[in-house]
Amino acid sequence: MNRRRAYEDDGDFYGERNKKRRRVSENQEMEERLETLILRVGENSTSSLESNLEGLVSVLESDLGNFRSKILRILSDCPIKMPEKCTIYSTMVGLMNAKNYNFGGEFVEYMVKTFKDSLKQCQWDAARYALRFLADLVNCHVISTNSLLQLLDSMVDAANEDNVPQVRRDWYVFAVLSTLPWVGRELYEKKESALENLLVRIEVFLNKRTKKHHNALRVWSVDAPHPQEEYLDCLWAQIRKLRQDNWTEKHIPRPYLAFDSVLCEALQHNIPVIHPPPHQDSFEYPMPWVVYRMFDYTDCPPGPILPGAHSIERFLIEEHLHSIIEMHRWERKDCAIHLLMLPYKDKIPLEYCIVEVIFAELFHMPTPRYLEICYGSILIELCKQQPSKMPQVLAQATEILFMRIDSMNTSCFDRFVNWFSYHLSNFQFRWSWDDWDSCLLLENEHPRPKFIQEVLLKCLRFSYHDRFKEMMPEGYAKLIPKPPVPHYKYSMEGAASLPGTATAHKLVVAIRQKCNAEDVLNELNDLPNSRDASDTDMAEAPFNPLKIDVFVQTLLNLGSKSFSHSFAAISKFHAVFKALAETEEAQICILHNMFELWVDHQQMMVVIVDKLLKVQIVECSAVATWVFSKEMVGEFTKMYLWEILHLTIKKMNQHVTKLSREMNEAKEKLARTVESSSSESEDEAASPNAQKRRKNTEGSGEKPTEEQVERMEEKLEAAYVDQKRLFLIIFQRFIMILSEHLVKCDTDGRDYDTDWYRWTIGRLQQVFMMHHEQVQKYSSTLESLLFTSDLDPHILDVFHQFTALRA
């Protein structure tokens, strides 16, 4: 057989196939080119924006026949993913609508579908940006004012529904108000009475609205020098100011004004009637927030004036900066460059606006949007990008924060400490400490000296102790941390009189000679049990505190060289830990001995507790009980102790989430298995290869049985019980110590509002805020068991503020 001949005969076939490949490749290249052109319109260019828009519209119009769906999709995605370019894309759509009315109608339908889908999928930012874009299309004569007003009215109707969460109602009003800066002037000129009616309805809603959540979200407990306004109240004040100015603002670029003569001739489309999807229990809405203010015009140097707190320009600038952070947060250098290149940067004190917005994100309650280190790294990059201005503005901001720290929220205090210590570590720990020496006259529990002490403790994690002794002024000696060394009591003066010293020394020799877990237990067996002398609950808590004391202190001291040495020691003698820590009381004893050894090394305690939890030597409930134990009273206002408690809660939350995910995946696999089995049994007679196909598909993954799924459900249920118990322990201990303090102060006739009280009530609030998603599940249980009506109002109010967040 002539192989060459066969290939020659097939030449036409292969040639045709290659042509098809080339066509597909050409189409793909063209689509990518169109996408790039649309995405980059309005960016740096030698020609004007108007000429770029005209040229791009001509290109898109000529390609509509081949790439219609692609163009529709890109044009509807862009204003949502790049909201700062909203008016550029609305102008583009307006010009295309003027040339091709049918395309304009298709686009409006597509955009309305995008808006409705965003609402159904609880993509609230996307929905708000889609609404804004639809509103801006009114300015470009694509959509009629009547149909937009009808849509805005239906949004306000949704805000007035009964028996729905307030956070849902709030969002619908916020979406309408935040759209008005773009379209307010057009509505004012053409439908003034309808616009006024809309605003009256919103005002009535706002006047009836409760704001129990407000205090929980404040950065400071006082309003001087800047009021801390709830977000809807602030935006409403800004909209009212905009109305007073006849809806004229100076920030939004409006390229469509250059094409007014073309756009005004275009036919308009009507938005179909849109009914917002009804509330469902599975829907999660954005939580309320407080608008953060750090600067006003008096803080800025001569030059461009900072817009007032109630000017709409302040809202627009801040939203633009927040949007840049959201878009570029993964690349700190790009983020810093884009922040510094904000349009209209010459008309505002840009550095002050940027710093205020970044701290607003960092101090956002209940938790920041992104990791705290994200904001710290962006601020460092800003200082590098603009060394002549940014470091000075940041130093001024730090000074303002320090001077107002007395009334700062406890969670924000922690974040301020974390940020400042991280920032100092990147700038050789240089700071003008002498400017703050007035705080040395205050009590150690006062927030100012406490802040400096906590900052130095955090800085110690980035450096070494001797450096701080040399660096800090002499007056700060009492705030400098002690050297982070272990205190091994069996090698201290007077250790010979301790009952476990001889065994401890033997244990040191044995461990250094590479003994195993069984050898260690044999060494410990000779130690007497002080609990044998009494019959107190021996059946319930059969553990020997002296064994734990000798073993834990000796082992951790031998592993004290580094974190890795400590981890290796814990891993090697894991079996000994498990044998000694069979009860919660024994686990608390382990933690107490770790604390005795490492009392001056907070970071070591944090990582060791984390390790003990990870390898399941101690339970989460034991850590919580230890944190609130009498032995830890002296540590109660120190940050590291709450770092330990929060990592413990997070460990429990992650465990529950993991089990829940695994169970849901197993249920889905089981359901698919049952479904495929039934369909295969039906097809088996018709298809002789069905059994073979089934064997092939069965090998693709392990399928759970019903018994396995039931066991997983039981494990998840047990995890939920443990999680609920953990929160009950924590909140019960808070209530006990706070109630005791309040009663004692009342009895003694003293003011209850001490530094200790403010730290403790702040920590209670912090637990609610940091873990709000998990605590929310048990709010009814907490209300019925702990936060009852007879509780002191000061404590109860914290709980009510928390429940109001999602009310």
From Swiss-Prot:
<dbReference type="GO" id="GO:0006370">
    <property type="term" value="P:7-methylguanosine mRNA capping"/>
</dbReference>
<dbReference type="GO" id="GO:0003729">
    <property type="term" value="F:mRNA binding"/>
</dbReference>
<dbReference type="InterPro" id="IPR016024">
    <property type="entry name" value="ARM-type_fold"/>
</dbReference>
<dbReference type="InterPro" id="IPR015174">
    <property type="entry name" value="MIF4G-like_typ-2"/>
</dbReference>
<feature type="region of interest" description="Disordered">
    <location>
        <begin position="669"/>
        <end position="710"/>
    </location>
</feature>
<comment type="subunit">
    <text>Component of the nuclear cap-binding complex (CBC), a heterodimer composed of Cbp80 and Cbp20 that interacts with m7GpppG-capped RNA.</text>
</comment>
<dbReference type="GO" id="GO:0031047">
    <property type="term" value="P:regulatory ncRNA-mediated gene silencing"/>
</dbReference>
<keyword id="KW-0507">mRNA processing</keyword>
<dbReference type="GO" id="GO:0008380">
    <property type="term" value="P:RNA splicing"/>
</dbReference>
<dbReference type="InterPro" id="IPR015172">
    <property type="entry name" value="MIF4G-like_typ-1"/>
</dbReference>
<protein>
    <recommendedName>
        <fullName>Nuclear cap-binding protein subunit 1</fullName>
    </recommendedName>
</protein>
<keyword id="KW-0506">mRNA capping</keyword>
<keyword id="KW-0539">Nucleus</keyword>
<comment type="similarity">
    <text>Belongs to the NCBP1 family.</text>
</comment>
<dbReference type="GO" id="GO:0006406">
    <property type="term" value="P:mRNA export from nucleus"/>
</dbReference>
<keyword id="KW-0508">mRNA splicing</keyword>
<dbReference type="GO" id="GO:0000184">
    <property type="term" value="P:nuclear-transcribed mRNA catabolic process, nonsense-mediated decay"/>
</dbReference>
<dbReference type="GO" id="GO:0000339">
    <property type="term" value="F:RNA cap binding"/>
</dbReference>
<keyword id="KW-0943">RNA-mediated gene silencing</keyword>
<dbReference type="InterPro" id="IPR027159">
    <property type="entry name" value="CBP80"/>
</dbReference>
<dbReference type="Pfam" id="PF02854">
    <property type="entry name" value="MIF4G"/>
</dbReference>
<dbReference type="Pfam" id="PF09088">
    <property type="entry name" value="MIF4G_like"/>
</dbReference>
<dbReference type="GO" id="GO:0005846">
    <property type="term" value="C:nuclear cap binding complex"/>
</dbReference>
<dbReference type="GO" id="GO:0005634">
    <property type="term" value="C:nucleus"/>
</dbReference>
<feature type="domain" description="MIF4G">
    <location>
        <begin position="31"/>
        <end position="243"/>
    </location>
</feature>
<dbReference type="Pfam" id="PF09090">
    <property type="entry name" value="MIF4G_like_2"/>
</dbReference>
<dbReference type="InterPro" id="IPR003890">
    <property type="entry name" value="MIF4G-like_typ-3"/>
</dbReference>
<comment type="function">
    <text>Component of the cap-binding complex (CBC), which binds cotranscriptionally to the 5'-cap of pre-mRNAs and is involved in various processes such as pre-mRNA splicing and RNA-mediated gene silencing (RNAi). The CBC complex is involved in miRNA-mediated RNA interference and is required for primary microRNAs (miRNAs) processing. Also involved in innate immunity via the short interfering RNAs (siRNAs) processing machinery by restricting the viral RNA production.</text>
</comment>
<feature type="compositionally biased region" description="Basic and acidic residues">
    <location>
        <begin position="696"/>
        <end position="710"/>
    </location>
</feature>
